[in-house]
């Protein structure tokens, strides 16, 4: 029984995690209250933390792809927890701010730093994404949303 419990806890913490969607930033794809399964191995197993005791790294690392729906740790203290957005731009991409997608007309932003991604919600009403938070560091990425459980 103890071995089974340890196996389940290890599987849950290392391979998959279930989150509940709060808000409508990815409507109509994800609705408030949906339970989503996040694959923590999608981009490699995350080890350590940039601000932690052990140095950050990824085992079997893979890059986030444009269009992936990604779960990531919030980069600001005022918004604790895990956020979910779609990856819109990759490291090195220039993002045009204004018109139909982003925030300030006539301005640009660059995900120039290595391992930074531009994340956007699908809902124009939601601003809890890179338009407010800025590019998201790869070290904050938890994993890729692989399915809606219920």
Annotate the PLM regions.
Residues 1-150:
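Extended hydrophobic leader/signal-anchor segments used for secretion and membrane insertion
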């Amino acid at each position: 029984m103890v071995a089974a419990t340890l196996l389940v806890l290890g599987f849950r913490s290392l391979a998959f995690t279930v989150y509940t969607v709060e808000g409508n930033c990815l409507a109509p794809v994800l609705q408030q209250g949906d339970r989503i399964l996040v694959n923590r191995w999608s981009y490699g197993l995350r080890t350590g933390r940039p601000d932690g005791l052990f140095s950050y790294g990824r085992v079997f690392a893979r890059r986030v792809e444009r269009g992936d729906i990604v779960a990531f740790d919030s980069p600001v203290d005022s918004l604790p927890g895990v956020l979910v957005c779609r990856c819109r731009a990759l490291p090195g991409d220039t993002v045009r701010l204004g018109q139909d997608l982003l925030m300030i007309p006539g301005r640009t932003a660059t995900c120039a730093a290595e391992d930074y991604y531009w994340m956007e919600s699908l809902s124009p009403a939601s601003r809890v994404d890179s338009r407010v938070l800025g590019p998201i560091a790869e070290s904050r990425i938890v994993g890729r949303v692989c399915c809606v459980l219920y």
